[in-house]
Amino acid sequence: MHTFKDSLNITVSSGSGGAGCVSFLRERFKAKGGPDGGDGGRGGNVVFKVKPDLKTLSFYKNGQKLAANNGKPGMGSRKSGASGEDLVIFVPPNTRVYDVFTDSMLFELQNFDDEVIALKGGRGGLGNVNFKSSTKRTPRFAQPGESGTTLDLRLELVLIADIGLVGLPNAGKSSLISTITASRSKVGNYPFTTKVPHLGVLKSSYEDLVIADVPGIIEGASRGMGLGFEFLRHISKTKILVFLIDVASNDFMSTYSILVNELSVYDVGLSSKKRIIVANKLDLEGAIENFNQLKRALDGEKVLGISIYDNRGIDELVNELFALSRI
């Protein structure tokens, strides 16, 4: 299971160019040879590149400072200095890069082969061989290298999953994802146990499905209440939604309306996605009766009943998810 670092800030710097060289040709029988100082090398670029097997931003630390290498200085005999090595920052697909100070998105890396040069390294300085003229036969100066540049960036990962698991706090999402996948999401009997999105993988012999355990939605989440809309965007690109409803609670009938409303307010497209309504906690008193009432009220919706406690309905749910993914 991966715990998602949804957003972090880093500071990146491109390399400075190497200084040009002041040098003069020295050969036998030529006591006063002409200038032969080479140019400095280019500073390293800052490059962002998608790495397909990365799933999180956790390879980097919040506030980390990263820099490309500087170019090497020029040398005699008109030899140029070596270019500085580029700083390559590998990120998962669907990573957005923002300027911290302007809060503007600079670029987005979506596909496996995406690559962006965020900062170019400084140019190398010209060696003194470039400044020889009819009036300056022996130039004793060269250019310094151009300084590199620095940017404070915010990286944001838009979580991509096949299935988005949504529900009110304490509906049992973390327990469900732990049951049907190999993940072990933090489980506890209090609201907002899941503070960040988690991923789990449903495996079969022919297909894997990634399921996102998204923090609990509350009424008003689309306006930033509770854990807010920052987590709603994580399910914006999923193919299937699973609405998990605690049918042992007194307000189980209103839960469906709250979930649909909050998703619709945030993004009207979310409410039209393929979905399954899953009634949880069938092992508790009164839950079966409530489940039947929910099915009657939501005629036309796919409504399944489960109990994580005694594994009731789990296999049927998993099979239904695989079937729905192929439609």
Curated annotation (Swiss-Prot):
It is an enzyme of class 3 (hydrolase). Residues 161-326 form the OBG-type G domain. Residues 2-160 form the Obg domain. It comes from the Bacteria. Gene3D superfamilies: GTP1/OBG domain, P-loop containing nucleotide triphosphate hydrolases. Its EC number is 3.6.5.-. Keywords: Cytoplasm, GTP-binding, Hydrolase, Magnesium, Metal-binding, Nucleotide-binding. The keyword Disulfide bond does not apply. GO terms for cellular component: cytoplasm. Pfam families: GTP1_OBG, MMR_HSR1. CDD domains: Obg. GTP binds at residues 167-174, 192-196, 213-216, 280-283, 307-309. Its main location: cytoplasm. GO terms for biological process: ribosome biogenesis. Belongs to the TRAFAC class OBG-HflX-like GTPase superfamily. OBG GTPase family. An essential GTPase which binds GTP, GDP and possibly (p)ppGpp with moderate affinity, with high nucleotide exchange rates and a fairly low GTP hydrolysis rate. Plays a role in control of the cell cycle, stress response, ribosome biogenesis and in those bacteria that undergo differentiation, in morphogenesis control. Monomer. This is GTPase Obg.
